[in-house]
Amino acid sequence: MSDKTVKSTNLMAFIATKMLERQEDLDTCTEMQVEKMKTSTKARLRTESSFAPRTWEDAIKDGELLFNGTILQAESPTMTPASVEMKGKKLPIDFAPSNIAPIGQNPIYLSPCIPNFDGNVWEATMYHHRGATLTKTMNCNCFQRTIWCHPNPSRMRLSYAFVLYCRNTKKICGYLIARQVAGIETGIRKCFRCIKSGFVMATDEISLTILQSIKSGAQLDPYWGNETPDIDKTEAYMLSLREAGP
């Protein structure tokens, strides 16, 4: 097994432990799912003992380092509290320490960061494209990423948010909220896969299946074939998305 497998086990150990510390916030169904995740993670830990011996406590400690990004040698600007509107209600977002993550070679990342249409505010703007509600600002190859993971108090189900911001401006420029799922362990694994994919486009309650289809479309779109940023084309493209509407 690979080092990635060990890290994944450590992350799951940390998440399961932290969630069970908040049992009073969980309904019976969610608590049972987290207990099941903890049991399966302990089984994985025993399986890995032949090549990566460690205690449960060691796994939790390493998982916390991975989750919080403290193992990364990087300074992260402080994220300020914000809220996301979902179904007419504003839900708070609490930001964990940010991780610097490699962007990869997906052509969608080759466009520069641009200000919002008022020319001053660097904020995410909602667009409707290919059946998905998405938030996107252009990238100048400087994104950092934060993952926030906690039981949603309103639904007692796990929800995820990926928060993106530009190091040049130290302003939030996008976020992703993945749809709540009944299977917590499955949902967390999807969450990790989304991070590893290097694909960042924010959606509002859109399944990861649709997210992947948007990714495929973006890779095939000749517009994103530009190897150098073109601010005029970028602004025109963003404006066309806004005018297209839902």
Curated annotation (Swiss-Prot):
Mention any Pfam family matching this sequence. Flu_C_NS1
The answer to whether the entry has keyword RNA-binding is yes
Q: In terms of domain of life, where is this protein from?
A: Viruses
**Predominant cellular place of this UniProt entry's protein:** host cell
Q: Which GO terms describe its biological process?
A: symbiont-mediated suppression of host cytoplasmic pattern recognition receptor signaling pathway via inhibition of RIG-I activity; symbiont-mediated suppression of host type I interferon-mediated signaling pathway
Keyword tags = Host cytoplasm, Host nucleus, Host-virus interaction, Inhibition of host innate immune response by virus, Inhibition of host interferon signaling pathway by virus, Inhibition of host RIG-I by virus, Inhibition of host RLR pathway by virus, Interferon antiviral system evasion, RNA-binding, Viral immunoevasion
GO function term, MF aspect, one: RNA binding
Q: Which InterPro entries match?
A: Flu_C_NS1 (IPR005187), Flu_C_NS2 (IPR005188), NS1 (IPR004208)
Gene Ontology cellular component terms for the protein in this record: host cell cytoplasm; host cell nucleus
Q: In which compartments does the protein localize?
A: Host cytoplasm; Host nucleus
Q: Which protein family is it in?
A: Belongs to the influenza C viruses NS1 family.
Q: What does this protein do?
A: Prevents the establishment of the cellular antiviral state initiated by host RIGI, which normally triggers the antiviral transduction signal that leads to the activation of type I IFN genes by transcription factors IRF3 and IRF7. Also participates in the up-regulation of the splicing of viral mRNAs.
Q: What is this protein called?
A: Non-structural protein 1
Q: Which gene encodes it?
A: NS
